[in-house]
Amino acid sequence: DRPIVIGQMLGEVEPEQLVRSSGLRPGDDLILTKGMGIEATAIIARDKREDLLKRGYTSSRIDRCADFLSDPGISAVRDAQVATQAGRVTAMHDPTEGGVATGLYELASASDVGLDINGDALLLMEETDQLCAEYGLDPFGIISSGAMLIGADPASTEDIVHALARAGIAAS
């Protein structure tokens, strides 16, 4: 009932600067930027505005959720740039389709490693958590454009997280 636009980009990179989703190694740390469900939060707020108003949500709260497309935003380019400049990044993956759960699976599968994840430590904004509860959605499985899963050498993790924070990008 509305147009949908899909795009793809290609580019060139120096081989030594290429970070693949298949580069995760046993013992690496995982960092999640911005949080789960950024785009899903905006979609729900935009598509369910009238229903949310009926459920007691204020217009300003719905507007805040709808604005997740621009703040924190659905591009993870800056996240990747900051992380790779700050320390040893071994793998990166954009958990858009299928959310963070699928992104974690794809990282592990591509890298042929297992993962030990503390789900409670992953970033989840209050707005996203509440909308998921409202509509019976699992935050781990909703579209998460804007977030980035980053594999990091443990010796670099703290430097990467601090650099992201200095750049105004939340990370856990």
Please annotate each region the language model reported:
Residues 1-172:
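Helix-biased detector of long, well-ordered alpha-helical tracts
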